[in-house]
Amino acid sequence: MRNSPFLCSVHTHTTLCDGKDSMEDMVSAAYTAGVQYYGISSHSHTPIAQDQGLVLPQDMTAYCRVAERLQKQYEGKMEILLGLEWDSCADVSFDGFAYWIGSVHYLKCQSGAYYAVDLDAETLISCQQEAFHGDVYAMIQAYFEQIAQVAALRPPILGHMDLITKCNAGNRFFDEEEKIYQEMALQALQAVNPLQTVLEVNTGAMARGYRKTPYPALFLLKEWRARGGQIVITADAHTKEGIVYGYADAIAFAEQAGFRESVILTANGWIPCPLQE
């Protein structure tokens, strides 16, 4: 069988963090959907109070045990990789996992308060006003500086690198076509090493009705391609129905940026995959 992006889903969440379905049900749904390379990537623990119950505990033993049991159960039928979506403010290590996704979900102000950039518009307003004195571009700059810091750690996958646009429908907070914004985003992208990190084309916000196109924006994908970077199609699935949600749209979007190939993550590393069969 020829490789296809639909055979791989490596950005997924379960009830062990903020997902809606159990690890068992997510794995079963992936197998039923024809996925051959499935990655479990729950959110890493953070010290943020409002995160508790939505991220893994600091002791990830139970998480690993469930995954290992499922790996044995599906041996010979589907590869299951145990990974971690590691946040910039995590207080645990990503060492020991088959792979990890580097992400930024929070900005921290001088008072020590954390603001989620992807929760809702109200939180983003509070972040802008309280942490950045109303300066939206100072907030954006701080976000992309954190993206660059995560990129410097050489994650196998860089997650939804322009997540700060999630609540920006209709350019509510800033104009995504404006030069000042795009220069900040492109500067962060320059920190990503295309020889060591794969950029995900992530449909998660599409599944939840926040966006009509995947992360990241087309101008970022075009620049990434110009630098010789590779992409992986992901669903950022939080439900068993979302394992490969929006993949056809993500493929078409990547093709607009000039890509003809993505990669698939396997137990033996990355393998190339044509976007079209």
Predicted regions and their residues:
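An N-terminally biased module of ancient metal coordination in phosphate/nucleic-acid-related enzymes
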Residues: 1-88, 98, 165-179, 238-245, ...
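Structural preference for beta-strand elements that scaffold enzyme active sites
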Residues: 5-9, 37-39, 79-81, 98-101, ...
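Conserved, mostly hydrophobic/aromatic
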Residues: 11, 30, 100, 160, ...
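Extended substrate/RNA-proximal surfaces in nucleic-acid metabolism proteins
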Residues: 58-194
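Glycoside hydrolase catalytic-domain groove-lining segments
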Residues: 167-169, 175, 179, 186-202, ...
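Short Gly/Pro-enriched loop/turn and capping motifs at secondary-structure junctions
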Residues: 204-208, 238-240
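Long, positively charged, glycine-interspersed low-complexity recognition regions
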Residues: 213, 217-277
